[in-house]
């Protein structure tokens, strides 16, 4: 450092010293200035000070940095010089003085250690990435989390669902207003199961049989409801006077009177006749035994309980005809009713239990199901047991409650309309209540409900016969209050006429019944006639489905049902005169001369009918046959002039009696009746009063047989048509028929002398009106009972000062005389005097419910509308008009000709043949309908299937009314349903009435349990519509008496529950338990809303005793069912050669474990078991809104049709169009249920499309109707639970749920499917479908583009045309590749063309066809067996299958088959897997790789790393659920000794487990279990594939051939001799297997038997390539083995086709789905 620098530093220091005092001085002066508050330099001084402070701060910082930098630089320079100069120099110098010696061995060992450590490091870090792809460790916890999440999802709907189960009126049966009305009762805590809520629930459960009820209707129906308590043992007589009874607490036994043995045998013999016999021959054989009065009724004057018929008029007529036929000349003959047949017997005939002595105790009777009543009132047998929540009244009793009031109107003083339970109409018991009910009902019909006290007193005094003393009534003590005597002695019944009904109820326990009295139904019918008709329609439908259908299909009582139509034709008489018949016949003949009758006469309506019933092949054959025979159909609407407004309104209350001029247009010849053609004619015969009717006063005075209708004579030529209604041969005669016989001249005048305008007086109008009047007559409709009296629906009493009495007791005659009767007197609201203001306010708040009834709903208007729909049809002889068990077409009135009514039965030797042809059925003629008769009556009432077949016996001319028109008009003129109910109930036979009392209608909501395993079997069930799942718990079978009590045991038992199957519409179950008197062997749970018919065990036993034919029929059905179930599980025969057995097919394979650690699935353990996956109803439900549901459904429906399934798709639009005006009505639920049940019968598959918002009722309907729910989701969307899915969970449905993931491209991102499935434990299966949705999105985005983009899109559209493609192809040949690539990049960047995705070239690989085959139970499976390198031939078999166009829907494999099958299932394409398999074979055949993998042979010779890596290189991170095609592989669990089936998890891991050959590879560890090769238990898993629902299976076996050479070496064996024997070429003894070979054979014992069983499995195509010359480890011969498989596959499939053994491949001959956009998909080129 020099002196200049020192001087410079000293100057700086001195300068700083001079500055500091100045700074301090300035600061001090500044402070003084501030203190003084004055000074002009304050601002300048402050600014100077701030600048100085900033300068000083930055100076200090810079000084510190400069000093630190200088020190760091000097230090670093020193360290670098030390390391680079001094230290190396020291090492070099010192190294010259040090000497190190290392031996070569140490060097080699050191290098080996370094190499091994490096290799293990690289192997563990880089080459073992597959180890991270382990199995899901916490499977149990995952499932528990899923269940918890599902429970959380259900938690939101817990209260609503609990209320839904308890309130049976939830949106389906009763209105929401009903919920509101009872919200005070049910609105409390659901956990409090109080008696009151239970009572209301039971009542609502029973009243649901009425269907939907409006709130005012429900209030009026139930406001007079009573409750009655019955002590145990008390007996309730069931007749119409009781009303509608419901058991709300306890149990009630229903008893039916025991039929006498003689009658029983006679009747049973009637229905055990030969096929050639008919009902007419039966009746003719019985005719001499029974006689009738001139009324056509039977008077049984026997004692109560013993009905011995005798002749009344003494004349027994005999017929000379061989078979009685219904013809116009024989309708005056009296046919005995079945009621009389069953109630007549000789005095000498004993009871059914004649072996029992009269001294048999009552307890013995009760033990056998019988009870006896005192004083000879009869013996009764148990029919059914009614529990709480079920109605006591039968369906016919309910109909009688509505129709009985009408009888009171027509005959106020009659003896009473007879209940079906009574035998004698004269001796019907009457009481004060019954009288008051009848007169009240009569007043209701006349619009005068309120009675003055004078009228009431007059009624009680003027009818003393009906007011018998209550003290003398034996029934007044039979059902009494708690204070009365319980068992009084009955007084003798000589003083009064009294009969016990045939059906009684006895309290099995202390019970409570709720009763709606009959006057409530009478008032309901008068006040709300439309609602009453809806109830009647509901009851008629249930009567048809429950009673008729069960009797027809299950019990075989078709003749009983057909007898109803026989009685109708015998009872009602309406025949057309000959001149009208000639009009019809001549017109058909004229048309036949000029033109083809088939084309010229078929009306649009009839052609529509023919096309509507092509749902199945049977209907197609029938309709095609009928279309050939149907010669002509005359549409009268073409020629009939339209009525003017003036002519259509001419009908007035006062009839106009004008003449009727008919112009006969079609006469081509002269007939004797031509003189009458220009004479005023009436279609109704002007008969004398004695022939037309009788004065009602005369009937009051006379009850003798002379007061009957005269017999009808045969129609003569030119005779006018006559209306003559026969009285019903049953005792309960309908009022609609008695109306025609009344002596009221004004009414008869209105009917017989209806005037018509001049426009109507044509031949068409005459024929039309005549046919309509005939059909309405058969329906029980006339002008009197179709009129609506004015003021009857006003709802206000005619006399404001009247009052009504509401009885407290059940029936006034039943009340005990000891207890005083309490009467509540109620005054009308008019008695209260309120202010006008309050009255107006109350009137505004309350909206009065009033049904809108058109004033044109009278007989004449109905007749005119019916006439417009009448058609004339002509059938040739032998034409099948209506076939049995097909939809009835409508109502037929026979104008001329004969129709045979036949029924078809299956012969006994064919009942077990499931493949029988329908032509082999026996046909039996029941009766014949001649001119003037009616056909198709029952099937047209509810528009359902016909129970019989109608065949034209001769050329037949009929008047036809289509069922669509009949249903529409009956719905408009709703009073027709009342008349139909009257007619139908009067025609039912006693046996049908007994069935109606005993059969129960059950309705189950989704997830409801019908019965549990271990419950007593109390009946047989027949599924009317819906679906049930059968569950079985093996643990409960082992210990049936010990049931788990705590939650843990219940959970464990639930895990072991297995699904045995599912039952659909028309199937029955429970017969085995009832026949064997054992408990239920399984549980039944409703998959969706289900309706069932229950045949009680007591009824079945009763029918078995009375009618053995029914018992035989049911036994055959049970035997057939058991035989069908046992064929799959029966012991297969042992296949042997001579006396040496070769295969024992009964050796069982270890089943797949059902525990959670062995089940690799996200759902149930049986999620993949689809052996009965023939779903009838499928619902397509999106997970969230915005998905193309309709487009997807359209493709799926089209695919179903291509695979041969008759399918219909339903969305909200099609359903609303069917419902018509009821679309938004509360009646839509009832209409929907019938419509859906009908579609399930017409079509094999019904697809419900949920195309509405989530809160829509249609969405809920789709979920409730589904056997299988398909959840639609877009694969690349978020896997969160959508709003539709939450609705599905809230519905608590147990239907099978499938997830469909839609992909734009035919590839799946690894792990993507798991994200969808792990949070959805309710999903049973999933599918990957290619469905390009960008087309829909891009089409909507075109509108938002600008003008330039629109021009480019126009160019793009031109390119897509055919001309544009040709031009583009020609240009592309001339341009170089570089220019073409530039143009393509430009177009893709600027023109925004639609993205094009790849689809497979082969059409049979269509994803929708694959989904349709799986859902319809027609899936095609491929099973690839194990065999080491021999399995490389699988690739050649796959190539042959693809070239043949055979699709594969499911793939399964073992060992090498699992590897090849997994690769094929992953891509579903042969080209990309070829290279992967070849690469894997090269790695395995590499000697150096195998040597590098050797280890110490304790467990195996290799570590398995190279093998694992080879598999992982082929599959990567892909999981099995990511495979495009469904796939599974098997393995052997040596820890649990079971077979494992893997369909979820990482693919490489379980494929490796299936290929783990013992000794060569170590077992795969999976959740604590060791897995080995699946070939040890089943080398060809065909049975698993069969259990998954595959109908056709191609099984490829490449295993080694078993050495079955017989050995003979004695009882001891020397090892040295074995070695010498192997070396000796001249030895005759075969080589003895070594220990290793014996162990291998021992391991494959189960597999060998499984293979033989798989070969004999139906539907399996066994393929065995010639690969015996190749060893297990010959992977180096890839090309050779592959070619062997390809060549053999082509030859094998070709031979199958030539020999006709190739199975039918559904959809193989169909083109691709027609609506796929061809320009939207591209085909993948054939390159790896």
From Swiss-Prot:
Membrane topology: Multi-pass membrane protein
Activation and inhibition: Inhibited by organophosphorus esters.
Positions annotated as active site in the UniProt record: 1455 (nucleophile), 1573 (proton acceptor)
A GO molecular-function annotation: lysophospholipase activity
Gene3D superfamilies: Cytosolic phospholipase A2 catalytic domain, Jelly Rolls
Extent of Basic and acidic residues compositional bias: 153-162
One cellular component (GO) term of this entry: endoplasmic reticulum membrane
Motif window: GXGXXG: 1426-1431
Keywords: Endoplasmic reticulum, Hydrolase, Lipid degradation, Lipid metabolism, Membrane, Repeat, Transmembrane, Transmembrane helix
EC number assigned by the record: 3.1.1.5
Compositional bias ranges of the Acidic residues kind: 345-367, 1036-1049
Chain sites annotated for binding a nucleoside 3',5'-cyclic phosphate 1: 854-987
Major enzyme class: hydrolase
Motif GXSXG: chain residues: 1453-1457
UniProt domain PNPLA: residue ranges: 1422-1586
Ranges per topology, Cytoplasmic: 1-44, 119-1728
Record-annotated membrane-spanning stretches: 45-65, 98-118
Chemical reaction(s) catalysed: a 1-acyl-sn-glycero-3-phosphocholine + H2O = sn-glycerol 3-phosphocholine + a fatty acid + H(+)
Chain spans, region Disordered: 141-167, 285-368, 406-436, 454-488, 596-660, 687-756, 1034-1055
Composition bias, Low complexity: 141-150, 610-628
Start-end of Polar residues biased regions: 293-303, 326-336, 406-424, 454-479, 599-609, 642-657, 729-756
Binding site for a nucleoside 3',5'-cyclic phosphate 2: 983-1121
Subcellular location: Endoplasmic reticulum membrane
Pfam families: cNMP_binding (PF00027), NTE_Ploop (PF24179), Patatin (PF01734)
Residues in coiled coil: none
Protein name: Lysophospholipase NTE1
Protein species of origin: Candida glabrata (strain ATCC 2001 / BCRC 20586 / JCM 3761 / NBRC 0622 / NRRL Y-65 / CBS 138) (Yeast)
Gene: NTE1
